[in-house]
Amino acid sequence: DAVAATEDIKSRLSQFGGTDLLAVGGDSAGGNLSAVTAQSVPDLAAQFLIYPTVDVHGDYPSRTDNAKGYFLDMETMAWFINHYAPALPEDEALSPLRGRFEGLPPAVVLTAEFDPLRDEGASYAAALRDAGVSVVHRDYAGMIHGFMDMDMISVAAKAARDDGIAELSKLLATLR
């Protein structure tokens, strides 16, 4: 659905504001959808991936280190993964880290220190960089999964959110 919606919007971009730049972005599972969309829809301007889930089968230290007690836990992640697409456990769309990276749009990837998804997000940023894709990766110390929605209750979360948005704004400014 994300790919189809993006292709439709891209085909009618002038109706939505008149520029020819279209970026995708999302957090957590939305980061997964955005990464898959960037791999599937050519000529996107940018991708903004916020603590994305990009490798459902990987084994990462952050999944052990942050498995419990930091808002998103691995028990909940297992439930999400088992219910997201149980008939397609090896589908590349579940793990875009195992997909292609050549020719992808530049990216801003945000991760959080105390997030089970931290290391896969960092690995995705590294894979983009290794493929020659321009990428800014920010790992926010002291932050947990979901910090982008915590700006009203945490000064540190607000600062991290504002920094991430500023990085995206800088990236988009270079494309105009």
Tell where the protein language model's regions lie, with residue ranges:
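Alpha/beta-hydrolase superfamily serine-hydrolase fold, recognizing
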Residues: D1-R176
